């Protein structure tokens, strides 16, 4: 392994997660060396030592592949001044640094080299807050250096040093040595095998409780992403055996001990033992219990329903079908009911009627909500009644996980009626959180299209509620929205029936552009986007929807190409490059993490209207926000988004890339969901074979959940 010393001349690239960087190092021989590393980029001007080896990149030539980086302690007074200034401490500028150097003289080099930050507290003339921050920063630099050496000695990338220090502080190395698997809790991108190898180096054997515990936690953490609330015990043992390659009896005994301690929960159903993480068990069991309590009550409102329906029809120049009338009557009569149907079946018109009817019936405290901001806005426009997102309604607890809300059973919502739209997006944890906050006196109406993609997260609540046959529901089948020749709706229903849509027909609403290569696809997408952009007033009314995020045909790369084509650099446009991504005034962006302080949530799309020295200013549907540039990891470019991210939204124009390289993502419900996002126009850019594959592929991924069975009373809690 080679070691090179020098200073960072320029940072070229750093990814969003700050786990990969490219920078130019100027060594002590005045040679400029391109370095790459899987760690947070060092700051420009810092003296560092990188360790690694030279490699030959097929495109960029000779580079230094660094496995670790260490900030060097200064060896002269000029370097000491630069070192202290580069610490980036607020209120600790050039004058303050001069005070430190004047007070310590040459001794500052020894203090920094031997990591004795406690002596900093003796300096006169500096504010206590600055001295405390300087002490903590220098202490942290020493610990980071120790962590870097620790990781390097075990042949592990030092990219995780900073996140470990943030969590464990001065005890970082001691914590890891005691239990290296704690790394998996604080370093989300670390593989289990990395921590496992470190544990082996530290003498932890294969059946050690710490290893079994970490393996189990690793498996259970993946359940939510896979849609499961639980796993059959045999599958859980099998997965752990595959991961740990240890004695199966040890695994079984360990699971049994956790069940006895209450650290895991279980349920028997049809002679199979299902194992739950605690939060999933509570969400499933309590979510069902809240539902049952409402189902046991029937509380019809004081309203002449037939007369109300007739008057609503006259006032709005419409005629309800039998199923629509049934849905309205059921919602007024039952405390808990469902309405499901595809596009154009009148779900939103029914919601509008329900709002009016409940108001006339004396139940005026009505809430309309949906999982996403765009869905809530659409609901507001269609019903002329203010709707909100579920997250805003429940008021998230800042600093906690995504399902911890201030509104709950102890502090319920002050409502008479709640109508939840786009309910196909409800996973079991969000459903539980919502039901816990609904008072027992309220009417609950759940509305959604059960044929869309299942939710992100565990369970498929809407489907389970319908399939249980325990919940009063209405299924809408008759199409009303522009029923005369609406090819978007016709194509969506054809896809849902497993039939090919007409890809050869000439239609303003639904069209197909065949392509034979990736380059052709990208050119067609850009050409169509530019053309359709001229027909809309709102940039948010056109959307590219891709089956997946990563890869050459993924939404991330498509967004980059479209940005260059429709919003190129210009001297009058502000722009900023953060973590390797360029953001420019006029760009569409999507929020990818909940920001409770700014009240902007995952999935919301906006447009950048200004960029300042410190902030990216974004106009979202419901508000304008100033996002600090150092928090830009919370957004991504959004010219293209995934189908999952598009759920709950509608756009005037939808462009759908659909090519064979999407592989296993070519599924019927995915294509159906993408097509039904469009109000006026759908353009599919791809191949006939990809569409054919999706139409005939029914997503058969099994989700392990006993929500339906609990509702039916067929399994014990």
For each of these PLM feature ranges, what is it?
Residues 152, 213, 221-222, 266-326:
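Pre-P-loop entry segment of helicase/translocase ATPase cores
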Residues 20-28, 35, 43-51, 58-273, ...:
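Accessory alpha-helical DNA-binding modules that contact the DNA backbone or grooves
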Residues 333, 353, 357, 361-364, ...:
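Conserved helicase motor core of SF1/SF2 NTP-dependent helicases
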Residues 347:
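Conserved lysine of the Walker
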Residues 604-717:
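C-terminal accessory regions
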Residues 13-25, 613-617:
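Short aromatic-glycine-enriched beta-strand elements
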Residues 450-598:
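Conserved helicase motor core of P-loop NTPases
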Residues 1-15, 52, 608:
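Structural detector for short beta-strands of small beta-barrel domains
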